Amino acid sequence: MGAGLPLVLLLTLVGSSQGAGPGMTLQLKLKNSLLANSSYNSSFLDFLQKFCLLLHLPLGTNVTLHQAGSSQHVTCRV
């Protein structure tokens, strides 16, 4: 990818299923090399689920990875 834009992981914590409650967004910049080999296969969603566990995120937390031209999304189910 070279000098492409950095990957940014956005975590949105929603207080209710309708999104009407309080929320928080956390932005993390990740190295392209960390996800370069897994960004287009099914193990990438497993990576996001493990990220939920690592950060002890509450059930229903929306995790989205934004990259130039695409995004991946998972809802924490822990």
Swiss-Prot record:
Encoding gene (name): SFTA2
Protein name from the UniProt record: Surfactant-associated protein 2
Disulfide topology: none
PANTHER family per record: SURFACTANT-ASSOCIATED PROTEIN 2
Function summary: Putative surfactant protein.
UniProt cross-references to InterPro entries, sorted A to Z: SFTA2
Keywords: Cytoplasmic vesicle, Glycoprotein, Golgi apparatus, Secreted, Signal
Top-level taxon in the UniProt lineage: Eukaryota
Signal peptide residues on this chain, from the entry's feature table: 1-19
Subcellular localization(s) per the UniProt record: Secreted; Cytoplasmic vesicle, Secretory vesicle; Golgi apparatus
UniProt keyword Glycoprotein, yes or no: yes
Sites carrying sugar chains: N37
Post-translational modification: N-glycosylated.
Positions in coiled-coil regions: none
One GO term describing the cellular component: transport vesicle
